[in-house]
A protein has these predicted regions:
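C-terminal cap of thioredoxin/glutaredoxin-like
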Residues: 2-3, 8-30, 102, 106, ...
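Structural alpha/beta surface segment adjacent to cysteine/selenocysteine redox centers
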Residues: 16-118, 193
């Protein structure tokens, strides 16, 4: 019913990751979690993101900082923007989500918290080790797993798929495969779309 394409390197994705779970629980539908590399999307079809980071519009940048703080307060999440390391290389973390499969949600949540709430560099093996230990994952098979070619290929395939389906960033959310939404602030529309879909089942 709901597909959630995500990269933990985005604060807006952290908000959406947090907010979509109670929405899905309320409506009795499942979320299919699809890890991606948002940098791969930017490199392929949305390179203007890099230009806007290099030469931001001051007024817009100030407002975006306020907007993020407002959403974080409303959601009850601690988000430091920008983190000390930004942008961050999230490839190992996102491969970890792929490797964990149906068990990825606690790991993804811990990665979001480590990066956005605790200002830890999630590109570092030491941080990933700590995150694994915190939630009861053995680091040794974790690091072996994320090095497997099949895991690397699946992460790339997820990223290529969301682009092919019209996505341009993270989070990209689909209801019933074709109805696409982008961003945390689309939750009311996603809720309406799911309700309409349930009516027509």
């Amino acid at each position: 019913m709901i597909e959630f394409f995500f990269d933990c390197s985005s604060p807006w994705t952290y908000l959406a990751f947090h907010n979509i779970q109670p929405l899905a629980d309320e409506l009795g539908v499942e979320v299919t979690w699809r890890p991606i590399l948002v940098g791969g999307i930017f490199n392929t079809i949305n390179p203007t993101v890099y230009a806007s980071r290099e030469t931001p519009v001051p007024q817009k940048a100030r407002y975006l900082k306020k907007d993020l703080a407002d959403w974080a307060r409303s959601t009850g999440l601690a988000i430091k923007m920008p983190p000390t390391v930004f942008p961050v290389n999230s490839v190992k973390a996102m491969r970890g989500c792929v490797w964990l499969g149906n068990d990825m949600v606690p790991f993804a949540r811990a990665i979001f918290e480590a990066y956005w709430g605790e200002d830890q560099d999630i590109s570092q093996d030491s941080v990933l080790t700590h995150v694994c230990q915190r939630i009861g994952i053995d680091p040794a098979p974790f690091f072996a797993g994320i090095g497997e070619q099949a895991i690397k290929d699946q992460l790339k395939a997820n990223t290529d798929e969301v682009v092919a389906r019209g996505g341009f960033g993270s989070p990209t959310i689909f209801v019933d495969k074709t109805d696409m939404y982008f961003g945390n602030d689309r939750m009311p529309l996603i809720r309406e779309a799911v309700l309409l879909s349930l009516i027509h089942i």
